[in-house]
Amino acid sequence: MILLTRNRIAKHTIVTLLLGIAVSQNSQACRKPPAEQMVTPDQQIALATDVSVARVIRATPSTLPALGGRPSVEYEFEVQQHLLGFPQSRFILVGAQGETRPGPSSSDHSDGKFWERGGGRLYNDPDCVLRPDFIVGEHYLIFRGKPATWRSFEHIETVRGRPNPNDRWLSFVKEKLQDR
């Protein structure tokens, strides 16, 4: 009788552990980002439909529910340079509060990892969705539309109130879009 009870407890413990492992794997960080986020710079340019250099002029907490565990924020942008797509002077993107960008190893996108497949300075929320954060007053090279990648919302350093003209990513995108 005692042996039977111990076996039941052991089975129950094993089942509980396995269930816990299965559930916890789904609640962990994004282990395998979607394939469409893992592109090369050339692939990103080929897929682009709307590209602008824009400055963040407003960040407003959104009434949308918090997704990915972080509160939603509406960011309003003023277009500084329109590079591709339908020209607009302003647009709004919904992102999230809290940092989603690791510190850059270079301020002008000259670091090698940025240029690799899947490179960029943005990372996913635990549900594998990109919800970028932005800083009011700063410039960004924005690729709007699908697919959003880790390079779709890159900060471009501000030099004397303007986007850095020597930024490698910005220069690359401008050159490639002229050739399209």
Set out the residue ranges of the language-model regions.
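Bacterial N-terminal signal peptides
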Residues: 12-22
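Transition segments tied to proteolytic processing and entry into folded domains
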Residues: 25-180
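Bacterial N-terminal signal peptides that target proteins for export
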Residues: 2-14
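Generic detector of low-complexity/intrinsically disordered segments
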Residues: 5-6, 19-21, 179
